Amino acid sequence: MFLTHLEITWKIKIMENKDSEKLLKLLTKNEDEIIEYKVNNNDHERIGKYISALANSSAILNRQFSYLIWGIDDDSKEIVGTKFYPKTEKHGGEPFITWLERMLDPRITIRFEEYDINQNHVVVLVIHMKAGRPIAFNGSR
């Protein structure tokens, strides 16, 4: 069962972040070629592959942005929270986000946004696709 717009609005009413309306709109959408929900996936290589796939899907669909969202149950869209904190993650001693950006070719803009919703941590990765060619992660498209 999917949450209704009203139910999602109620769930994030405590949010203090000004971007809550943007998050609300994302949470009303089902997974598709440009939106992917995860709960606790912190496998760095897999995240990089997701970014490449989502960015390339954005290009094919002529969409500027795609999203990878942690802390949301795929099926119910319930806000369950995540233990993934990208801004403090490390990959081999290097900051995770720096490593991730370095592994993408060509470089694209990615932005991690973090929210606390009713004591549940939610992370939204915004992938801005503006490159004129397919995005590769670690040499693979």
What are these model-predicted stretches?
Residues 2-141:
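Conserved N-terminal catalytic/coupling substructures associated with nucleotide/phosphate chemistry
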